[in-house]
Amino acid sequence: MKLLNSLILLVLTCLVSSINTQFISIQKYDFSGNCKNSSDSASSFEASSESAAICMQNDLLSGIVTNEGVCLIFNEVPTTFIISTKGDYIVRSIYDINDNNCQGGIIENKAIEIDECFVECADDYHGSTYLFSTETSLNYPSNTFMEISYNGECDGQWKTSFNYLQYYIVNKCNVAHEIETHTFSVGCNSTSSWVSEYAGEVCTVEPTVTTSYPIVDNCGDLDNSNFIDYCNI
């Protein structure tokens, strides 16, 4: 009887743990919006009045899926994300640009509404379109190149000790405006990934340069985290 009770308790504990586990999904879409006349356009989140129109799945460019509180680089600065106690918004905590472990103290907190498209403005005419959401299971799209951080045994079984992953939709034209305009597309196969860079803000011409990288499978880098690349095609 004691054994049966122990097994029931173990199952219930696993179920509660599974139910309480939430991942934060950050999806970046092709820019669509108006940043003109935004105050503090270099750093503020500007809500779009066309929230239902700008986050179309066909316009998805890249994304991040992360556990709460994990230190990662987001828009060029060290950042952590947590879900509010009531689960109605996500708190983005920004750290000093040189604080790659997010341990030197928070510079700024920003509250981000869940499941609402918004534009983070770079200037009057450029910005990035995002959609933040929460997930109870680990989800990511196909036709992507993925960079994954995980802890524990360095055996490639990253789903059991997952920190975060960043993905890029392959062969999609990305125009980044976080610090300066940078236009690129990403491709991959089982042995390598490559980044093609373009002049201007379109990818319809020949790339100015294409750089290839071997698929990464590193152990114990950056505060004992393991990193692995995955071509999810």
Curated annotation (Swiss-Prot):
Keyword RNA-binding: no
Keywords of the record: Glycoprotein, Secreted, Signal
Keyword Nucleus part of the UniProt annotation: no
Record: glycosylation sites: 37, 189
Transmembrane portions of the chain: none
Signal peptide region: 1-21
Pfam families: CfaA_B_C
Protein's cellular compartments: Secreted
GO cellular component, as recorded: extracellular region
Record protein name field: Counting factor-associated protein A
Organism for this UniProt entry: Dictyostelium discoideum
